[in-house]
Amino acid sequence: MKAITSAPFTLALGKCLFCRECALRAPKNIRFTNDYRIGSASREALVIKPGDEKVEFHPELVRPEIPKLFGQALKLRQVSAAGDASVEMELNASGNVNFDFGRYGVEFVASPRHADGVVITGPISKNMAEALDICYHSIPEPKLVIVCGSEACSGGLFSESKAVNREFLNKYKVDLWLPGTPTHPMTFIDGVMNMLSLKKR
């Protein structure tokens, strides 16, 4: 997994583990901030180039039916596709008394039959590929897909593992990319609110 390229110089947040080792080694070239607004409707927008000050969300890439249909209430089914539970714990925290994302009508549900979309965490192992596919097809149309965490965005540390099967992401459109190891609750909340047009960026 290579999050950094040298020619041209870029940093791919979808592959980044946020260990900050690169910033320690090259403090004049790389600087991490506390800005949690790093989600995007475009995978390409997660690639940071020299001079970039923030990650662009690109609302024009959001399917127009998403804010129209899910702006008042959004029910999500979370699938841990071989994740390490770090992103899953942060997603759980998004509904606690500190963040209270449920006040906007966004909640996690136990069954894909009751969901409007799926939130994928983990690198998507071969053992979870079929289960994820079944979950996706169990969600009624129209539906959306959110990938959450660097493992889900790129495979993370396991991107070159033979135990990973990421064909799902080639078959279905991803509506929201949320990097992070793990993804902060505010990153998740901000990304979903932008996707649903619940706030002005």
Show where each model-derived region lies.
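Iron-sulfur cluster-binding cysteine motifs and their immediate structural context
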Residues: M1-A41, L46
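Short low-complexity, flexible loop/linker segments enriched in glycine and/or proline
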Residues: L46-V47, S161
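N-terminal, charge-rich interaction modules
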Residues: P50-V97
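Cofactor-cradling patches in redox/metallo enzymes
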Residues: M89-L91, G105-I189
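Short gly/ser/thr-rich secondary-structure transition/capping motifs
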Residues: F99-Y104
